Every structure is written in structure tokens, then in C-alpha cells.
């Protein structure tokens, strides 16, 4: 027991005996850590510092307790270190956040166009069902703007071509696409040619023109027959059996085409494509089509005549290009056997979808059988009970050729009137003047007869000769 007080008395002298450098070593790192924020110290150094600080802070009587068991000094020194360790992390987070913001700002110009494009797509209306079901039709509309720009013309069959929201425009593009069996490239080529042709030909103006009655009178008609469902059946009639002169009608091919186009445009107008409110079912029935009848009664010249062949070939080329999918059916009535060459020519220029609509009928009186609902309206000539085409149909404007001016003949007529008025006076004067002469001549003749009775026989002989020569002269004339 006597030894213990000695040990306890010596303990307070230890701190004083400590060199001052130890105190500076403990305080200097704290200052440097707060300013420079060094890396965390090793665990061994931390324990040494904890021991020294514990000795300095604790009173002398508590020195007997193990320094490790004192919990209060250690947290006091560790708390700043934890904060010091967390501070760099927080700063790095802030710097990363700032860097990310700067990167976002740098990326914003590139992202803005994408965002705008996405907004535009969202704002666009949903694609119509007829385009969604038919990708080829959608592609065709994608090309329409370029087609109209290249041709410089936007009118087709009385319809101004617009976009895919316009029903009449949709129906026209469907017709061109169906005529080419869904091939967008071929449909585009045909539409381009048709627009260019209409720009040059101006078919709408041709319907207002006037055409020779001698050349085209009685050759073409258009009829409208109302049906029970409220619709109308449009029929064009071409009666080539009424041709008066082959050379006059077919010799001028351009003139013939213009007349034929004018008649076709009248029929197309009655289809009322511009008033359409329903899109045609691509795979279904097309209500905007007409019937055509070609009558070849008494026609026996089509196989050999080159003039008619040229006109027919040109007509087929123009109509197959400019008027696709406008025919429901086409009937060739009163067709002679020699017309086979014409059907062969048509198959060359027209698609199978078109040629299957052609129906030759040898007897025109059987035509009405093809349309039982229209029998009462069809002309009697074609097996119906209706009026004739001349009475019931309409056609292009026809005019008769004006007679040639007869100005040179009018002057002689006036002179002849004056001569006729003066003739009686002159004749009366002549008769009065010649009367004495004639009386003298008659008296002389009577005297001659009495004096020369034998001269009569030669005169009779001369009369007989002239009578025999008359037929020969007449035949010679």
C-alpha cells in the first residue's frame, strides 16, 4: 500500500515533462486538415492522437482508467474528421451536378429539333383508314406534289387535285393505281402523261366547241338513265355505221380525236366525280363508271382501210392513257367477223383488267338483255322500249357547213332581171320591125312552092338522115 501513493504522485509530472513538439504535432494537423483537406490518416496515427489528446483533456485522478474505455474524447476528434471526409464528397457531387447541367445545355441545341419533330408528329392527325389499308396509295400521295409541280397542271376530269384529305382527289388516284394493278411507279407515269396531255389539249374547252355535222352528225350520243336506287347509268354511244364519208370523218385524225374527246368529257361530267363524298373501295365496286356502246351496223371497211386503222389506233392510245378506270363495261354490237384485228390491237394497249370488260355482240337487238332494269329506257333498235337516240340523247355542238358565197353569181341575176323586164319591149319592137320582112318572105316561099314542086323530095331525104344520127350523138354525149 505504501507503494501506490508514489506512483500516483509521479503521474502529474508526465505532461509537463512532455516536449512541446507533441502538442504542436497534434494541433498542426487539425489546422492543415481544415485548410487543405488531406487524405484520412492511418488508424495507428489516429490511435496515438487519441491517446495524447485523452491524456491532456482528462484530469489526473482518471489516468488509472484505460484510455480506450473513455468514449467522450474520441467522438469529439472524429466528428470534424467525418465532416472533413464528407466535404469532398459533397463538393464532388456539386461539381458533377454543374458539369451535367453544362453538358445538358450543350446538348440542348441538338435535342431541340428532335423535340420539335416529335411534337409535330404528335400534332399530325391520324392517317385515314383508306391510306392505312393501302400503303401503295399512301406512297402515291407522297409523290403527288412533285407530279403536279413537274407538269404545271392540277386538273383531272373537272377535279382540282389536292391532298389525301380531298375525297375526289383520292378517288382519281385510286383509279390510276387500279389501272396499273397497284404499281405506284407506273401509276405515277400515267398520271404525269395524262396531266401533260390535258394541259395541251384542254378537253374541258373542247366540250364547248362546234363540230361539223357532215363529218360527225349521228355518230355519237350520251344518255342518262335513272335507276331505282337513285343513281344514274351513263352510256356513251358511238354509231360508226352512220359514217357518211370515211375520208371526211377519219381522214383528219386530230379533228376526229377532238370530237371523240369532247363526247367523252360530256359523259365524264355526268359522273359527278367532283361531288364525291365517299372514297372508292379499292377492292370493291366503283360507282363512278359508265357504259359504252360501239355500233358497227353496216360497217364493212374496218379491216383494210388504213385511214380508219390510224384513227382507231390513236383513239385507243389516247383513251387508255387519259381515261383509266372510267368504263364499267364496253359493248361492241353488230360486229362483223373481220373486226377481229381491232380486239387484238386493244389487248396490246390495255390491261387485262380493262379488256375483260369488253363484250362483242353480233346482234345489236340483244343488247337490252344485258340490262334488264334499263330495258324500258334503252332504244328499240337495241332491244329496249325507249325512244331513239336522236330523240332522247344529247351530243356535242354540231353545225352545218355554210354554203360558199355566190357573190359573182348575184350580179348576173340582177342583170337578167333587168333584161327580163326590157325583153318584152325589145321583142315587141323587133316583131314590129320584122313583121313586114316575114310577110315578104312567106309570100316569096309560096311563090317558090308553086314554081318549084319537085324540090320537096330532097328535103325529106335530109330529114331522114338527121333522125338516124341522133342516138349516136346522144350516146356520144
From Swiss-Prot:
**BP GO terms, sorted:** Golgi to plasma membrane protein transport; regulation of exocytosis
Instruction: Indicate whether Transport appears among the record's keywords.
Output: yes
Query: Would you tell me the Gene Ontology cellular component terms?
Result: cortical endoplasmic reticulum; cytosol; endoplasmic reticulum membrane; plasma membrane
The record's annotation in Pfam families points to: CRAL_TRIO, CRAL_TRIO_N
**UniProt keywords, alphabetically:** Cytoplasm, Endoplasmic reticulum, Heme, Iron, Lipid transport, Membrane, Metal-binding, Microsome, Transport
Low complexity: bias regions: 7-38, 49-67, 451-477
Q: Which residues cross the membrane?
A: none
Give me the residues that bind heme, please: 240, 260, 294, 296, 330
| Domain annotation CRAL-TRIO: ranges | 215-390
Q: How does it sit in the membrane?
A: Peripheral membrane protein
Source species, domain of life: Eukaryota
Where is it mostly found? cytoplasm
Q: Annotated region Disordered: where? A: 1-127, 402-477
Protein location: Cytoplasm; Endoplasmic reticulum membrane; Microsome membrane
The keyword Transport is assigned to this record? yes
Which reactions appear under catalytic activity for this entry?
a 1,2-diacyl-sn-glycero-3-phospho-(1D-myo-inositol)(in) = a 1,2-diacyl-sn-glycero-3-phospho-(1D-myo-inositol)(out)
Q: According to the UniProt entry, which residue ranges have a biased composition of type Basic and acidic residues?
A: 80-124, 402-450
Query: GO terms for molecular function, please?
Result: metal ion binding; phosphatidylinositol transfer activity
State the SMART domains in the record: SEC14
Instruction: Return the SUPFAM superfamilies for the record.
Output: CRAL/TRIO domain, CRAL/TRIO N-terminal domain
Cofactors that this protein relies on: heme b
Sum up the protein's function in the record's words: Non-classical phosphatidylinositol (PtdIns) transfer protein (PITP), which exhibits PtdIns-binding/transfer activity in the absence of detectable PtdCho-binding/transfer activity. Regulates PtdIns(4,5)P2 homeostasis at the plasma membrane. Heme-binding protein that may play a role in organic oxidant-induced stress responses.
Family as reported in the entry's similarity comment = Belongs to the SFH5 family.
Its name, as the record gives it, is Phosphatidylinositol transfer protein sfh5
Q: Which organism is it from?
A: Aspergillus niger (strain ATCC MYA-4892 / CBS 513.88 / FGSC A1513)
